[in-house]
């Protein structure tokens, strides 16, 4: 099993979520995040004063999938999240040794 983690632009979340649901992905975890990569934040003007925003708002999306679905799900996320601009985000996978559905006690792929 794999945990797929994606850091995305917030306005792309609905598009990514819809694309994943169209591929049969039935569960995901979404949380707010902030950070920076190559774009290094940005400068804004508020009431005539210029200030630098070091941490850019992002969304962290996590999806747990069977190994055989990992590459396909990553491709779906990348395609739906891409704008072609700096700051589109990152997607990575992490091996998962065990998953347990708390309600039923199911383990492994049956618990996804």
Indicate residue ranges for each PLM-predicted region:
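Positively charged, small/polar-rich N-terminal and surface patches that mediate targeting and assembly
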Residues: 1-112
């Amino acid at each position: 099993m794999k945990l797929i983690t994606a850091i995305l632009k917030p306005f792309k979340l609905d598009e990514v979520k819809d694309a994943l649901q169209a591929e049969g992905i039935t569960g995901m975890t979404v949380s707010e995040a902030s950070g920076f990569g190559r774009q290094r934040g940005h400068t804004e003007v508020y009431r005539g004063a210029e200030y630098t925003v070091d941490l850019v708002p992002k969304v962290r999306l996590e999806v747990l999938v069977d190994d055989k679905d990992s590459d396909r799900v990553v491709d779906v996320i990348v395609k739906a999240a891409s704008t072609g601009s700096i700051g589109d985000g990152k997607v990575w996978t992490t091996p998962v040794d065990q998953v347990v559905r708390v309600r039923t006690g199911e383990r492994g792929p049956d618990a996804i």
